[in-house]
Amino acid sequence: MTTITLTPGSVPLSSWRALWQGATPKLDPACRPTIAGSASAVARILSRGKPVYGINTGFGKLAAVRIPDDQLEMLQRNIVLSHAAGVGEPSPANIVRLMMALKMTNLGRGASGVRLETIDLMEAMLAADLLPLIPAQGSVGASGDLAPLAHMACAMIGVGDVFLKGERLSAASAFRKAGLTPLPALAAKEGLALLNGTQFSTACALAGLFEAERILQSALVTGALSTEAAKGSDAPFDPRIHELRGHRGQIDCADILRDLMAGSAIRASHLENDTRVQDPYCIRCQPQVAGAALTLLRQAADTLLTESNGVSDNPLIFPETDEALSGGNFHAEPVAFAADMIAMALCEIGSISERRIAMLVDPALSGMPAFLTPQPGLNSGFMIPQVTAAALVSENKQMAFPASVDSIPTSANQEDHVSMAAHGARRLLTMAKNVDYILGIELLAAAQACDFHAPLRSSDALEALRARIRQDVPPLDHDRLMHPDIEAATGLIRSGEAIRAVNRPLPALEAAP
């Protein structure tokens, strides 16, 4: 398995993507003196005997309660146990791994006051594939992702359930099997440092971002095939049009659409004497819509990359002056905004894809047999797959409502404005799954429609895509059970096979120089 070294404060997006895909994180040893220095600063701050939030006081609304020195370990244990109040299904393993890696780099900046052995245990747990069970629901994204991260901290002290190589076990049993030892106690500040932060929301948002990147690339591929199937023009993809407007995402998307269609005999067949003046927007405006989505995703990526490398704890420890400063870096509003942008992009990618499906199955718009079946009437063809796509689009429209505009006071109004980042980020994988199905249906419909143009061939890239889908799904000559075909085509979208089939460099989150 690939190991990724994380240097706190400067981890690139490619490393977070690799961790989402299953790589194992290892913290850069160069940050160890910084971590140790931060823990020593906490001890010096405590020695002054003054109240410092979260170190020798209660939490939230109880911040005015002073805790005696002999109860500081109990204070940290209590916050972990009491805050582990999440509900719902366990979060996916790759989300949990990403969350823990984010927390490691956050703590590795040396502003949280945790000990080296605390971070070392997190790294060892990830290396052993020993993952805390993190209930998916319960965070409002301020004061950080308290409940999810509390469940992580519980596992680290041997409490609750975990997954060891995918098997659900008690934490105590799993640590024994893995040959690891949980922390016997949490030092001053450590419980709060583990709980405070946006790592769960950020992990979910990054997961949604990486899925959205793949989906956008897939949509450009299926959209190009639909353009060919509809005998659409590539003239609207002329670079001069897009350079005049100036949006980089739009320019990038127009470039790849033009490249994907280059050399097509289908396009050449209607280059002259075409009675149609303009294609419908779902064909003609692909660069504008996909480009705007790409721009949103790139903006979200910038925000999430900054958040991933930043420190979202409270209070923050400054060893050079032995200060503990209280602030609000735990408020996940930047993550919530980024998640909302990703949701908007996913929704629109699916929406315009469904419109291309609807165009292809409508003989008045496509000029092909109704519902893309050779014998309409006796056969219904792609009638209901389009309905399924419409249903999925409608679901995504509801989920795309911005989560960040909602807030509800918590903790006796001490935490009176919250971000809802966790909810906003968690929905992204559900939305992405819906768009995968929509694009899978478009891939089927576009491949079927291109069959009606035989013996004319499309471009080499799009013919390779058609050949790949035909390995799994034969042409629809007569009605048959459609569900397996949709699952097979969606599998090509979800696995990235559809992208790889065209063998072209597609627009990515990291814009080409």
UniProtKB/Swiss-Prot annotation:
Its main location: cytoplasm. There is a cross-link at residues 142-144 (5-imidazolinone (Ala-Gly)). GO terms for cellular component: cytoplasm. One of its GO terms (molecular function) is histidine ammonia-lyase activity. Keywords: Cytoplasm, Histidine metabolism, Lyase. Its EC number is 4.3.1.3. It catalyses: L-histidine = trans-urocanate + NH4(+). Coiled coil: none annotated. The keyword Cytoplasm applies. It is found in: Cytoplasm. It is an enzyme of class 4 (lyase). Contains an active site 4-methylidene-imidazol-5-one (MIO), which is formed autocatalytically by cyclization and dehydration of residues Ala-Ser-Gly. Belongs to the PAL/histidase family. PANTHER family: HISTIDINE AMMONIA-LYASE (PTHR10362). This is Histidine ammonia-lyase.
